[in-house]
Amino acid sequence: MARRQATTKKRRTSTRKKKPTVAAKRQMTGNVIGLIGLLVTILALLKVGLVGMVFAEFFRAIAGNAYQIFAGLTLLVMGYLMIFGRWPRLTWRWWVGGNLFFFSYLLLLEIPMFNQLNHHTDFWSLTWNLIKNDFAKGGMASNLGGGLVGAAGYSVTYPLLANVGTILIALILMVASIYITFDLPFHKTMQALRQALMQLGQQLRSGYEWLTHVLRVQIARWRVHQQVRANQAASTEKQPTSTVPQSAAPAETTSGTSAPDSAASAVTSSPADLNITVASDREASPIKSPTSAATVDHEQELQGTEVMDDADYQLPESTLLTKIPKTDQSAEYATIESNSQKLTTTLASFGVQVEVKNVSLGPSVTKYELHPAVGVKVSKVVNLADDLALALAAKDLRIEAPIPGKSLIGIEVPNKQISTVSFRDIVEAQPAHPTKPLAVPLGRDVSGNLVVADLSKMPHLLIAGSTGSGKSVAINVMITGLLMNTKPSQVKFMLIDPKKVELGVYNGIPHLLTPVVTEPKKAARALHKVVAEMERRYELFADSKQRNMQGYNQYIRQQNAADGQSRPVLPYIVVVVDELADLMMVTSSEVEDAIIRLGQMARAAGIHMILATQRPSVDVITGLIKANVPSRMAFAVSSGTDSRTIIDSNGAEKLLGRGDMLYQPMGMNKPLRVQGAYISDHDVEEVVNFIKAQQTADYDDSMLVKDDETDAAGSGDPRDGEDEYYAEAVELVTDQQSASVSMLQRRFRIGYNRAARIVDEMEERGVVGPSEGSKPRKVYRQKSADEAPASGNDA
């Protein structure tokens, strides 16, 4: 019972109050201090009575003219302290950054104050005296600048750095305070600033282009109007048989003969195009003064009657082309840093240490240039292409290892947002090359730089790519680029289009030697006519003892200046074949022979070829054609085999299509990736119609292919497909009364394919019979009566 009572006895509780803890006392103290500080700050801001003036002078002594900002910040801090009983819990970045920014602001306030007072020493004492004077007068009339805090900083910076240095120090401290406060990475800030400046620059550039476009159009119209009036006056006042006065009259006016060219150059874009105007002025000067013709630059392709024919010809303006708005690729900039990190991390996981040295954002791909660590094999990076594509979630990527001329490895990653390269933009950005009439812009490389191809340096170009890869657009870009840079007397075209739908739009322009050739048999004959023209030109070179077309044209100019005649100079000839595979299927031997001869000898004669095909197989692009066409342009293909057929290396199978190409001109070891320019069919028609409105087509009768010529080729004309050994082979077979391919190979020392074609041709013409397996062919042609005794005597 005693134990039970002990357990049920109630425990006594103390009724005394607990003493306040240390935290509660601290919070109460904070509340009181906050209340007092809040009251003092309010009195200072409102300047209530003498007490308020005293408190206001206290804040002015510290912060000077910025005392209201200082008091406002103090009010916020004291209000927080009064409510929560503790100081605001801010990180050290906010405290340090905020105080540093406010100090920089006070330092800037000191500069106008002391410049106004013209006082440059003892800044602290002067500020303190001004504060005492205001306090004694009971007012705030004096300019205190940045107060005692600002005066303390100014007394250090001014003797060392003067006012300019003080301003720079203050601005640097402000920027540093922002970085400290918000913990901003420097490279991200610079990248954001760069994007903002680029957008601003693009807007300013668009406005400037619009304004200059309007001015150029008005100036061009005025110049063309003046030129028309000058030409009308010259044609009515001067005799057509007098060459010198006809060119002298326009030269006396301000616009002169160069007005059409200068008008075109004024509209086409860049300030460098003004060089074309100078070149046009030189073209008029030899006619005005024949004695000065020997000093004319060799690039002038028009003299005598040709200059008079082209005097009114105006080059097409870039305003005829559609202006495509630029694509916003700001999202691509945002992914550059993350992709760079993914590349280094992925390669590091495979034991390959690299460092991203440079990144180039192009129209269709972004190129990351990596520097491998010492001991890293290049092949190891190349073998990880699929793993890198997986890490970047890319469709496909191309690795250039190493980059020519650099100790870096290039990784080209496709962009999610592809920027279209406008043909008008690259035409306006192309610098003027009066000495390079065959220079045409192709597009832009992965760094955004303009890529210009010079046909005279190539000298022949092979284009290959699958359907829809941009091959036909590239051909239109090159042809239109030549039409916009040259006159009909400078460049002539031979266009061959077996598909009949790609190049037909150019029919009727004065630059054509013949209408667009669409039949394969006529195309083979047309190529042989170009070969004949090449041989004719070499005969002219031999007679004049010149080595190439430029030297011959210069020689003709000198002769014209000496005797007053007007001998024509030779224009460039550009042969364009849009589908080589179709020609090789129908007339392979004739086409191949003509292409090989032109490839070997046509450069010095001023004849250049552009061959395009969508089937880059070895039976179309034969070894002889590849050997004689050194410059290549590969678009997207289906396999690495096709890529190796075009450019002798892989890479074209990884292209994106839509103008993405690998361009390898003669002399370049590795191909250059280029995003080709885009030109619409409407733009091509606009340029063609502009040219047709000025001149009509004047075809060369010697280059026209007639129907009877193709019929003669089918009947066995030796110049149109019959082998040169055919007649001798017929005599041999008739004499021996047996026919075999091996016999022709041994006797004429020719290859199997050629000998087999001769035997097949004899079979078609009824000379020999068909093949009967292992039995010899029957010979239908018998020896004549005169041949039989002769052969018997020989035996």
Curated annotation (Swiss-Prot):
Residues 448-644 form the FtsK domain. It is a multi-pass membrane protein. It comes from Lactiplantibacillus plantarum (strain ATCC BAA-793 / NCIMB 8826 / WCFS1) (Lactobacillus plantarum). This is DNA translocase FtsK. The keyword Metal-binding does not apply. Coiled coil: none annotated. GO terms for biological process: cell division; chromosome segregation. Pfam families: FtsK_alpha, FtsK_gamma, FtsK_SpoIIIE. Residues 231-272 have a biased composition (Polar residues). Essential cell division protein that coordinates cell division and chromosome segregation. The N-terminus is involved in assembly of the cell-division machinery. The C-terminus functions as a DNA motor that moves dsDNA in an ATP-dependent manner towards the dif recombination site, which is located within the replication terminus region. Required for activation of the Xer recombinase, allowing activation of chromosome unlinking by recombination. Residues 181-795 are cytoplasmic. The chain crosses the membrane at residues 32-52, 64-84, 94-114, 138-158, 160-180. One of its GO terms (cellular component) is plasma membrane. Belongs to the FtsK/SpoIIIE/SftA family. It is found in: Cell membrane. ATP binds at residues 468-473. The gene is ftsK. GO terms for molecular function: ATP binding; ATP hydrolysis activity; DNA binding. Keywords: ATP-binding, Cell cycle, Cell division, Cell membrane, Chromosome partition, DNA-binding, Membrane, Nucleotide-binding, Transmembrane, Transmembrane helix. It comes from the Bacteria. Consists of an N-terminal domain, which is sufficient for the localization to the septal ring and is required for cell division, followed by a linker domain, and a C-terminal domain, which forms the translocation motor involved in chromosome segregation. The C-terminal domain can be further subdivided into alpha, beta and gamma subdomains. The alpha and beta subdomains form the DNA pump, and the gamma subdomain is a regulatory subdomain.
